[in-house]
A protein has these predicted regions:
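C-terminal transmembrane bundle of multi-pass solute transporters/carriers
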Residues: 12-14, 21, 35, 47-211
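Short helix-kink/termination motifs in transmembrane helices of multi-pass secondary transporters
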Residues: 29-30, 38-50
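Juxtamembrane intracellular "pre-TM" segments in multi-pass secondary transporters
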Residues: 1-31
Length: 211
């Protein structure tokens, strides 16, 4: 029986990085994932604090506020699953990221529950658009023999999330929770605008297949 020699982790990782660099669209997908997980998704951890401290909500209404994002995400994911066109996943992914951050910025400026609630709900729709298409885009842009490696790189990008939580926690300590959400939202929007220039194929909805 012949033994199978498996490549080392470092050589496998270098191979994955080399392939990703050769495909600009993959770099763009992972870059937007890093942006969202650094500056967007950590905002969820501050919503209850804003609800209680800045909006003066009861525990029940704080729960309603936080859960509205989950409702938005559920509806958004269902719409994409049953009505989404894979040819438009690039646009859904890109603009969904904005659809999370822009309502988050407006939420940081709101003093009323009746305004904050739909903003958090809309953010949930954006989060669903982002999260349900990122893995699919990697698969669509990668040949079968490289898909597992590219999904691994995507997971590395997602792993930046805890750093984002530490960042927004520091901002909240220094400037208060609402101001922290405003700061990180603006940072994320600026970063996404930069990504729109560097990787325009996603916002344009271009064909990203490896052929």
């Amino acid at each position: 029986i012949k033994s199978v020699v498996r490549p080392s982790f470092t050589s496998d990782f270098r191979l994955a990085l080399g392939f990703a660099r050769s495909r600009s669209v993959i770099v763009g997908i992972i870059a937007i994932t890093v942006i969202v997980d650094m500056w967007a998704t950590p905002i969820r951890s501050i919503i209850p604090v804003i609800g209680e401290d800045d909006l003066g909500l009861s525990p029940l209404l704080v729960g309603v506020l936080v859960s509205s994002q989950g409702v938005g995400s559920l509806i958004g994911a269902a719409l994409i699953a049953f009505r989404g066109d894979p040819a438009k996943y690039g646009r859904i992914y890109f603009y969904g990221s904005f659809l999370y951050l822009i309502p988050a910025l407006l939420f940081s400026l709101s003093n009323w529950f009746v305004l904050s609630l739909p903003l958090v709900f809309i953010g949930g729709l954006g989060l669903a658009a982002f999260s349900t298409t990122q893995g699919a885009l990697i698969l669509m842009a990668t040949p079968p023999e490289m898909r597992s490696r590219m999904l691994g790189l995507l997971a590395v990008g997602i792993g930046i999330g805890p750093i984002g939580i530490l960042n927004i926690g520091l901002m909240a300590t220094l400037f208060g929770p609402s101001r922290a959400v405003m700061i990180v939202s603006i940072e994320g929007i600026v970063a996404l605008a930069f990504a729109a220039v560097v990787w325009p194929m996603l916002r344009r909805g271009e064909d990203i297949s490896p052929s």
